């Protein structure tokens, strides 16, 4: 049966830890969409691991891992990340990771184009990671991209890459990009990549009887190309639909959909953020939560938890259970606010707005909770939480339509987790 872990907000919710926890029992762990723009950190046995394109199931020695068809793979980053994991003790990791032959190749060329496209936008930048994800997905949609399986065929990458470069040169003029170097490297990757490439359909059929399949979502619902705060989104489908499509899952095999919700809100890059706190509260959240992007190192924007957004996310992803993360970051606040409604021009909005400019204008209605002003870091039992912290959790649960909050994160370590049965 399949468990899918999905971000419910703007990403950086802390999906890595619950994925790590669930992967201990998983026989197969998969990434369905996105690329090396994603990033999360896992602390396991006092060792810190950073993941971007690779599934974090690699930490578990009995778990096979797949980078699925819906992803875009920057091959140098794939090998760099794999080497870093092996250097930290995961010696057999390269024997447990596979890539769909239908996944797209993200070239250095795409990263160069990403920067040029952002520069053209000037004051209206999307705030991408600069990793080339958008241009790569654009080439996929335009049917001129390169698939991973084609890397194994002599001459295919060179022919297609030269055509891509020529097209972008016509569009942007001279590029600060070494075409010959990238062609040379991919000629070398042809042999190096071969042991990792699989036919996903045959691979998934082979593992169809796996007792536990874990799908690791990247980014989050509000960054989804269709359902997110467009155009301030990533270029892939980051929700439930993307997981099913990117891995050709049988929907009837899905046992659990885990929505990961941070106890407050953060966002990296540009785009609307109704509950953002450009004040001492935001600075305190940023400092206490150590809110810097794993991929870019950029400081994350911080604000209060937004239940309007989370309810919208739940309506699309149909969570069966919630993992609430980083509750301990709120330990030292006198009061804690939660957004429960939006108004526009004095009128209550009945749904989450599709237009980014509308989200920029909404008036947020909050419910205010008294803080608990005591240390919850490392708590592992529900009864160890202060009463005010319990009330905060229970309120979120009600706002999510009764979807149970099964796990509560109380710190960075693997065992800093409360599980409510």
Swiss-Prot record:
GO biological process terms, alphabetically, are: 'de novo' AMP biosynthetic process; IMP metabolic process
The residues the record assigns to binding GTP are 11-17, 39-41, 300, 326-328, 409-411
Checking InterPro entries in the record gives: Adenylosuccin_syn_GTP-bd, Adenylosuccin_syn_Lys_AS, Adenylosuccinate_synth_dom1, Adenylosuccinate_synth_dom2, Adenylosuccinate_synth_dom3, Adenylosuccinate_synthetase, P-loop_NTPase
The free-text cofactor remark is: Binds 1 Mg(2+) ion per subunit.
The UniProt annotation places Mg(2+) binding at: 12, 39
Q: Which SUPFAM superfamilies match?
A: P-loop containing nucleoside triphosphate hydrolases
The entry marks the following residues as binding substrate, namely 294-300
What keywords sit in the KW lines?
Cytoplasm, GTP-binding, Ligase, Magnesium, Metal-binding, Nucleotide-binding, Purine biosynthesis
What's an example GO cellular component term for this entry? cytoplasm
Return the similarity comment. Belongs to the adenylosuccinate synthetase family.
Q: What is the protein name for this chain?
A: Adenylosuccinate synthetase
Q: Source species, please?
A: Paracoccidioides lutzii (strain ATCC MYA-826 / Pb01) (Paracoccidioides brasiliensis)
